[in-house]
UniProtKB/Swiss-Prot annotation:
Intracellular or extracellular location(s): Nucleus, Nuclear pore complex; Nucleus membrane
Annotated positions of the N-acetylserine modification: 2
Pfam families for this protein: Nucleoporin_N
Summary of subunit composition and partner proteins: Component of the nuclear pore complex (NPC). NPC constitutes the exclusive means of nucleocytoplasmic transport. NPCs allow the passive diffusion of ions and small molecules and the active, nuclear transport receptor-mediated bidirectional transport of macromolecules such as proteins, RNAs, ribonucleoparticles (RNPs), and ribosomal subunits across the nuclear envelope. Due to its 8-fold rotational symmetry, all subunits are present with 8 copies or multiples thereof.
Similarity field: Belongs to the nucleoporin Nup133 family.
GO CC aspect terms: chromosome, telomeric region; cytosol; nuclear envelope; nuclear membrane; nuclear pore; nuclear pore outer ring; nucleus
MF GO annotations: structural constituent of nuclear pore
Role this protein plays: Functions as a component of the nuclear pore complex (NPC). NPC components, collectively referred to as nucleoporins (NUPs), can play the role of both NPC structural components and of docking or interaction partners for transiently associated nuclear transport factors. NUP133 is involved in nuclear poly(A)+ RNA, tRNA and pre-ribosome export, in GSP1 nuclear import, in NPC assembly and distribution, as well as in nuclear envelope organization.
Record's bilayer topology term: Peripheral membrane protein
Designated name of the protein: Nucleoporin NUP133
Keyword annotations: Acetylation, Membrane, mRNA transport, Nuclear pore complex, Nucleus, Protein transport, Translocation, Transport
Amino acid sequence: MSEKKVHLRLRKELSVPIAVVENESLAQLSYEEESQASLMDISMEQQQLRLHSHFDNSKVFTENNRYIVKTLQTDYSSGFSNDDELNGYIDMQIGYGLVNDHKKVYIWNIHSTQKDTPYITVPFRSDDNDEIAVAPRCILTFPATMDESPLALNPNDQDETGGLIIIKGSKAIYYEDINSINNLNFKLSEKFSHELELPINSSGGEKCDLMLNCEPAGIVLSTNMGRIFFITIRNSMGKPQLKLGKLLNKPFKLGIWSKIFNTNSSVVSLRNGPILGKGTRLVYITTNKGIFQTWQLSATNSHPTKLIDVNIYEAILESLQDLYPFAHGTLKIWDSHPLQDESSQLFLSSIYDSSCNETYYILSTIIFDSSSNSFTIFSTYRLNTFMESITDTKFKPKIFIPQMENANDTNEVTSILVMFPNAVVITQVNSKLDSSYSMRRKWEDIVSLRNDIDIIGSGYDSKSLYVLTKQMGVLQFFVKENEETNSKPEVGFVKSHVDQAVYFSKINANPIDFNLPPEISLDQESIEHDLKLTSEEIFHSNGKYIPPMLNTLGQHLSVRKEFFQNFLTFVAKNFNYKISPELKLDLIEKFEILNCCIKFNSIIRQSDVLNDIWEKTLSNYNLTQNEHLTTKTVVINSPDVFPVIFKQFLNHVVFVLFPSQNQNFKLNVTNLINLCFYDGILEEGEKTIRYELLELDPMEVDTSKLPWFINFDYLNCINQCFFDFTFACEEEGSLDSYKEGLLKIVKILYYQFNQFKIWINTQPVKSVNANDNFININNLYDDNHLDWNHVLCKVNLKEQCIQIAEFYKDLSGLVQTLQTLDQNDSTTVSLYETFFNEFPKEFSFTLFEYLIKHKKLNDLIFRFPQQHDVLIQFFQESAPKYGHVAWIQQILDGSYADAMNTLKNITVDDSKKGESLSECELHLNVAKLSSLLVEKDNLDINTLRKIQYNLDTIDAEKNISNKLKKGEVQICKRFKNGSIREVFNILVEELKSTTVVNLSDLVELYSMLDDEESLFIPLRLLSVDGNLLNFEVKKFLNALVWRRIVLLNASNEGDKLLQHIVKRVFDEELPKNNDFPLPSVDLLCDKSLLTPEYISETYGRFPIDQNAIREEIYEEISQVETLNSDNSLEIKLHSTIGSVAKEKNYTINYETNTVEY
């Protein structure tokens, strides 16, 4: 026996001090401080193991500044079946725990730190119905020699292990020393037992429900039928002896206390009060009907004393009724617990609100007065973190107040833990029971357990709650000592849970569900504030769980990436519809930058050349920004500056170095872009996080700024790299080998430009139009997107090209790619049909434009007959842009009037001049012919006239062009030099281009020639211009032509020129148009139109001195004025016009200078 005692003593010396040291240090040593130092030089797997393990072989599952949850080194689950009904119990005062099913009980030292915890196994007596019997209730008792006084030593410092009481059916079995029966079968251990038959009607379904070790008085147990039994376990000599207290031994009654219960009443709480003396202790009893009693029990006195007997149900109900009217009829009493003040108790109750299907759990502090058998409700408040209804009838919520076990505790703060079936709510309140110092909560928090975790028992000590689970052993909920309020900033509720999920959720077999209960009400502002704090800590590596450095930057980045993924997963599950899209985008941006750093780091560390360029870029940045950054500080502490430096790096690599480097360098740069932008941003950031995890719509953008990876420099670099690498591969004949990389770059570019378009549509139009950077980005896309598709088609990625173009609605790219396919193939035809249906109007219009641009008119008109109506609509909406094609369709459709109008619109309008002369003539002739097929009632004579006028103008242009080519005409000698000669030369060059010349230019060109025919033609054109010229221009040109006729006539070479031209004017009846003036001195000398504005409008497009040409025209007018110095010119004009008019029998109105018919 002595050897055994030595062995036990040695085992305690090995194990207990470790546990004692741990318990003493938990309040001062937080998990992160303990593990931080050794995180430096370990692998990722080793790090995770080390990160969450303590030196006593326990494993931390979560921690914040208020509590720690960890598992003790206990694995009793292997001894039981998963289907077994288990009961558990821990007595921290004794220092042992137990778990039992209906066959056996396991008992172990709860403070053991051994890897393989030794167990004491006690089998139960086998009965015929054991397989269907309920598991017995078991409780531990103090060692026989244990000092139970208030000044007793810690029981774990004593040698004896204590005893065990089993309530099996109606029988109580007591073993004084559990070590003496370890692993003995029941027959061998039976001689060590002491038994007592209890008046429990087990055959009628009555069973032990609650048990309380209230030593030194004995034990108290209650049954499911509301009966209570007090049993002493030792006689007056201290020897083991089970004895049912006389208090329960009255005939025809279930017990002396039974008068307070009815068939619907059950005991919900048995709690110990203080030890009053040798063998005497107070016990508190609460029922579900609100009856509360205080009893003084003694091991030597068979007559317990009842000190308090009250019903608190109606009082609690009344305290809730005003705020919660639904409390009436739904109030349930669950548990009670004594507070530090021996006269006060904390009660847990619940009420149910059917309108929202929520259960509110209420903590009521009640002060009792034993002298008057009365009570007062001091405070009432509701738990805010747990609102589920209790559906498991076997589980009742329980209150634990660890500080109560510390007799010398003078802390003004009381920690309260409420254990629910799948959660533990922890709160701290002020412990002062003073009406001027209300018992308001300091804080409240919740630790949720996984749904598959079953709680089978519990226990607690001065600092912790211990929860026995069926699957995970013993979980310790350690409440930290209250810190000074000013020592650290208060950590918000959301941030606390976010941090726990980030840093602890990936621990293997973690029993904690880190997601918040959905019923918790949290305001958006506090949620977003806390989420921003956590994201900043991970991003800038200043979170308390993030190591300052690991072996490599890659390892450090990977750790933070995993933390950020945990963070985003938690956000998605708990706050996805409670935070703004802007915050989501901010979180995504941080993750993407971090991920991009990882990808970037993995590439440049493999290339000395790229690494040197990066270091030089970083040095230049430091020089310009007056910084002292290193790659390490950028990646670890300042990743927000990485995009700026990365942009400078890419610009230098792509635009400076790329063309002159070898193919391997170019391949590395291409891989770098794909790894960073495609893998790091598009796949792992945008696709996985933005759209799949956080469920953002592509249209949801932060209108205040563009996404971090979209700016002109990035887009320009990626676009340039794509083409430079393509050309390099083509030169060495390896383009097909790198087609997958090129495809990724195209996907990058399309996504970036698409996001830019979405964002730009949210901005004010004025600010967009005024921003050159935005214009440059738009131009970059317009200039290059068709070429991206062209390259992909080159490497036979037409299918992928079509998919991309379809997805991003790049219809011009889609059409271009479809046109590279066999147009007669059934698959191609099917694709066209698909896109006609998918984009009914847009695709058709884009296809029509492409076919017109590439002169595939046969396909336009005949290949897609089912699109005929859409084609007509296209021509109508795009008129007159595509009128040169629309008329063909209109003629084929028999719409001759429409065809005539279309052709008129594209030829008659002077602003459309510049097209081919022959094409314009063709259009006009077809329009004229179409008029012959138009019904008379629908024919527009004015339109027909305009068509004829334009045909006449074209004839005039062809005439002068041919004469100039043949040398049959020449410029008047007066214009051999000067600005007018320059205008002449310019217009002659325009004639050579065989495009339609403006009517005003044509008139002026004719007026510069020196023969009668050339000077008469512009007069004919001006008389029938069909309103092609406005009034001022026409007036100016009339004066210009007549003036030059008069001046040429005044010279020797132009004698009788004026008379001949006037005669031809009357012969062809040009004056019949009232807009046609006859020559007069006033008309020839009119200077009113010769303003700088008019000259600029008329001659501004010519590269000549406008002042010079204005002076030359003034000189012409001056010469006319000289000719009329003696009024001779006026007389000559009248006589010439009069003689010709008389000959033709016309009457001249000299006041208006017109002919009267």
